[in-house]
């Protein structure tokens, strides 16, 4: 088959039918789905079973206990290791694909052999009664800019919009369970460190659902996981930084909160002044001018707030 789709599902009964309908009714038909029910406590498993009975492209696996998204991703990727499939796509159980998503991304990858991973924009909509209007994401389109935005742990790749070349990624041996959560960001950093290339399509190919408490319940896990991956990325981007400087710079670029001591901030500013002098070097294809411009703006704002000179 041309495409495999990884679909983790946990307690998603309210959204799963709409998600599955959007996948199974794609204009591109040559794919199968690996849906992993992560020991859901609701009717997620029953919904998956019912859909699988109607469409043989849906393969369902039920975990006996809840293991979390990193384990589910590792489970699915391990299952695909020996499968002859050209591309792999990600999807989340509470989101909705446009019906031409797979067709457009496959056309792009078929015609751009230099790109390993492609995402797209997304329409963000709110799962509440607030009446807030949907919003359109503004992800960078080019590899050099996507890698620049990795340094802020934001606005790089929208995980449930992504599709990648199976042979290109499976041989990297990525450990998706290296972090407690946020395995997607860890994957993108690992891919960048191995010289893989990214692109985002300009059109929105996904409706991304934002619902209350979507991240609040696991905020500490997210912070620890992203910090771990940020340190991995920053340490390779700037090999001259020592371990303390890497940790502090990673922390403030991701969390962007003033929780550090004055001495820690002085350490960060001094380290940044040192590494930002030469902007001509690009170790992994990142646009350092774009990257440093973004960090400059943030640091200048920070210094003005703190009255640093």
PLM regions: where:
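Conserved donor NDP-sugar-binding/catalytic core segment of glycosyltransferases
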Residues: 100-134
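Short loop->beta transition adjacent to catalytic acidic/histidine clusters or analogous donor-positioning motifs
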Residues: 2-3, 24-35, 43, 55-59
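Short, well-formed alpha-helical segments that are part of the catalytic scaffolds
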Residues: 12-25
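Acidic helix N-cap motif at the loop->helix transition within catalytic regions
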Residues: 15-17, 42-50, 96, 100
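Glycine-rich, basic loop-to-helix element that forms the pyrophosphate-binding segment
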Residues: 63-83, 88, 104
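Conserved nucleotide-sugar donor-binding catalytic segment
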Residues: 120, 140-232, 240-248
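A conserved acidic beta->alpha catalytic loop
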Residues: 37-46, 65, 92
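C-terminal subregions of glycosyltransferases and related glycan-biosynthesis enzymes
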Residues: 193, 198, 210-309
